[in-house]
């Protein structure tokens, strides 16, 4: 790979244009973009003369849908890394991917992955009805437990020496130690979708599983023979251990298709007539209710604009609408409305009821959700 394609002015400027989308409101980004010719030229000069020094990323924690540590990279470093990722790392690493690796790639994503699983279930039904089994895997702490030696070795095998050294420099600066990454950068996402590529080929080409799908570390196999799937499970676990990963024993199991499959936030149900129904998973509903209650409480205290809470709910609602969720959405709309009314009533209550006689703030609904599919 020609260095000019990674650290040349045109490559860096194009990368800057991509990186600024959606974050131009940030002061640091706005400053860089407003002074783009000078800033990009300076970055190019530093990279070509070997004087480039990346800055320290900022680490923070998100709690929804689950608790994770995230790294935020300074904008100028993101510009360089985006060019490195887009022009070298992504095209080289994804070249060997199987079709049914669905995360973080152009033309793929969660919606298409869900459609693909529906297609698999319909295909299975045409040959076997509902008399089949699923082997589903859960890796314990996928990113936090990634072995640095394994990831670096994986990149070394496929990249030219110069490109590999650039990737290695970034990894060593941002992620010291020998284990664990924060999934806040594109480079680590590429590592995430690449880490199990060897396993994908093993499952498809040696175990001969045709109905296999993976989204990052969430993957499953469908087959009519339970005993065969159980044998596959043990072989796959040994492969994962060889990569440095551990599985969650309780969640990694073989079970009947009739039990339903939870995948990417939805429960997939194959009916006796061959229809595939999607319901928002109970865990997802429960987590969103808890999240909304917390956001509404913060908004009532003046810590968060109501528009931000509305946007969060609208985003979840759009996600839920992709399933058979009419009744669930009706009930969630009522629940969301009740959260705002509940707070207002609580304030009125505090104003009119003498101290010591008021009741606590009671949840409008308890539990994992009473919508469809639960």
Residue ranges and their predicted role:
Residues 19-30, 60-71, 98-100:
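Glycine-/proline-rich flexible loop or hinge segments
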Residues 45-66, 79, 160-174:
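Reverse-transcriptase-like RNA-dependent polymerase core
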Residues 39, 46, 118-216, 220-239, ...:
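Conserved polymerase palm-domain catalytic core
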Residues 85-144:
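Active-site-proximal segment of RNA-dependent polymerases
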Residues 73-74, 82, 137, 170-177, ...:
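Right-hand nucleic-acid polymerase module
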Residues 67-98, 177-205:
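Conserved pre-motif C helix in the palm subdomain of viral-like polymerases
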Residues 1-41, 347-374:
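Non-catalytic, polymerase-adjacent accessory regions of viral genome-replication enzymes
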């Amino acid at each position: 790979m020609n260095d000019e394609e990674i650290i040349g002015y045109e490559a860096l400027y194009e990368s800057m244009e991509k990186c600024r989308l959606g974050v131009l409101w940030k002061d640091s980004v706005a400053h860089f973009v407003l002074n783009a010719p000078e800033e990009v030229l300076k970055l190019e000069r530093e990279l070509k003369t070997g004087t480039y020094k990346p800055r320290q990323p900022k680490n923070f924690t998100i709690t929804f849908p689950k608790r994770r540590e995230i790294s935020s990279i300074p904008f100028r470093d993101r510009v360089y890394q985006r060019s490195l990722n887009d022009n070298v790392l992504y095209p080289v690493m994804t070249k060997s991917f199987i079709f049914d690796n669905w995360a973080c790639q152009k033309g793929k994503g969660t919606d298409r992955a869900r459609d693909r699983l529906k297609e698999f279930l319909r295909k299975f039904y045409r040959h076997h009805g509902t008399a089949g089994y699923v082997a589903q895997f859960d890796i314990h702490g996928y990113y936090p437990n990634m072995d640095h030696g394994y990831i670096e070795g994986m990149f070394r095998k496929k990249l030219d020496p110069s490109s590999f050294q650039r990737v290695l420099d970034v990894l060593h600066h941002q992620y010291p130690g020998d284990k664990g990454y924060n999934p806040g950068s594109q480079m680590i996402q590429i590592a995430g979708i690449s880490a199990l590529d060897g396993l994908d080929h093993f499952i498809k080409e040696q175990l001969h599983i045709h109905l296999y799908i993976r989204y990052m570390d969430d993957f499953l196999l469908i087959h009519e023979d339970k005993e065969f799937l159980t044998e596959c499970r043990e072989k796959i676990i040994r492969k994962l251990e060889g990569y440095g990963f551990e599985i969650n024993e309780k969640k990694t199991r073989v079970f009947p298709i009739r039990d339903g499959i939870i995948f990417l936030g939805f429960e997939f149900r194959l009916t006796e007539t061959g229809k595939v129904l999607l319901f928002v998973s109970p865990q997802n509903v429960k987590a969103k209710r808890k999240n909304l209650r917390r956001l509404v409480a913060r908004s009532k205290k003046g810590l968060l604009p109501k528009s931000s809470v509305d946007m969060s709910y609208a985003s979840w609602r759009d996600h839920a609408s992709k399933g058979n969720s009419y009744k669930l959405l009706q009930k969630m709309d009522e629940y969301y409305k009740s959260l705002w009314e509940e707070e207002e009533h609580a304030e009125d209550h505090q104003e009119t009821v003498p101290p010591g006689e008021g009741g606590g703030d009671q949840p409008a609904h308890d539990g994992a959700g009473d919508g469809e599919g639960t």
